Amino acid sequence: MASAALIDADMAPTLQSILDQKTLRWIFVGGKGGVGKTTTSCSLAIQLAKHRKSVLLISTDPAHNLSDAFNQKFGKDARLVNGFDNLSAMEIDPNGSIQDLLASGAEEGQDPMAGLGGMGSMMQDLAFSIPGVDEAMSFAEVLKQVKSMSYEVIIFDTAPTGHTLRFLQFPTVMEKALSKVSQLSRQFGPMLNSFLGASGRLPNGQNMDELIEKMENLRETIGEVNGQFKDADLTTFVCVCIPEFLSLYETERMIQELNSYEIDTHSIVVNQLLFPKQDNPCEQCNARRKMQKKYLDQIEELYDEFNVVKMPLLVEEVRGKEKLEKFSEMLVKPFVPPQ
């Protein structure tokens, strides 16, 4: 009986299990565009701020909405949210310098490209010429947070699904690439050193051994992040959707991808649900509710081992601290529709 009660509690239609899991360090909130990811991530951050010493909310979506949600301007540096002393927010600038990513091994005050020898400017140009620079910038911020450990828990308000999946792949891709570069450096290092002469320095005065060491340090840090992302005690992903075919299809695709990356996900927030009263004369409302119920039934059938949170379509926009706080309460206390 105790185990059955535990299962029932675990699968409660709330995000309370995330608040109760004190080991969590990384929480991703993602889904298709326009389903309420930002509102959900802001609301979850507000709830977490009641339980944790320090919370950081990061927007990795190029179309930043955190400033709009809180009615407060945020930028690339973490800033306290008005009315909170332990909740900060920031919006990563996708057009910012890729140097942040390459600087993860540099000392404070040091030119981030210095450790990369003559390849610094070349790598920067290359980075901006390839797709996925948004993901690279987001990941650079993750590396910074891993090194600083300034916040107890970090929530990511992610970009639409495709960007998010590329971002979550980024650590594995980077780790493999840097591992290969390190291997080649060790293999051809002696030959290169013989060309460089007795000083063993690159044309701009940097030492080849220092370059290899910095790349190895970066690879180790990325490996650490990769390990944390795949640890269910440290990382989880909250899927946000609406009860429509395309959103449900995108959610299923995302969950399959997350499973293939070994990233934990056990929570789904279904937004914009209609709850018309029984004798409601509105034909459109009743027809839409009927359609929503069909997809909601599919969600509950497909994800019977998930915490499925049902959120109502509200009359007003959820903007500003007060409305977000009110919305956030429904993430931990199931919404009861009026009869």
From Swiss-Prot:
Superkingdom classification of source: Eukaryota
Gene this protein is translated from: get3
Residue intervals passing through the bilayer: none
EC number: 3.6.-.-
UniProt subcellular location: Cytoplasm; Endoplasmic reticulum
Lineage: Eukaryota, Fungi, Dikarya, Ascomycota, Pezizomycotina
One GO cellular component term: GET complex
Entry's family note: Belongs to the arsA ATPase family.
Function recorded in the entry: ATPase required for the post-translational delivery of tail-anchored (TA) proteins to the endoplasmic reticulum. Recognizes and selectively binds the transmembrane domain of TA proteins in the cytosol. This complex then targets to the endoplasmic reticulum by membrane-bound receptors, where the tail-anchored protein is released for insertion. This process is regulated by ATP binding and hydrolysis. ATP binding drives the homodimer towards the closed dimer state, facilitating recognition of newly synthesized TA membrane proteins. ATP hydrolysis is required for insertion.
Record-level GO BP terms: cellular response to oxidative stress; pheromone-dependent signal transduction involved in conjugation with cellular fusion; post-translational protein targeting to endoplasmic reticulum membrane; response to heat; response to metal ion; retrograde vesicle-mediated transport, Golgi to endoplasmic reticulum; tail-anchored membrane protein insertion into ER membrane
Keywords: ATP-binding, Cytoplasm, Endoplasmic reticulum, Hydrolase, Metal-binding, Nucleotide-binding, Transport, Zinc
Name of the protein in its database record: ATPase get3
GO molecular function ontology, one term from the record: identical protein binding
Keyword field contains Glycosyltransferase: no
Residues the record lists as binding ATP: 32-39, 244, 271
Active-site residues per Swiss-Prot or TrEMBL entry: 61
NCBIfam families: GET3_arsA_TRC40
Subunit structure: Homodimer.
Location, primary (coarse class): cytoplasm
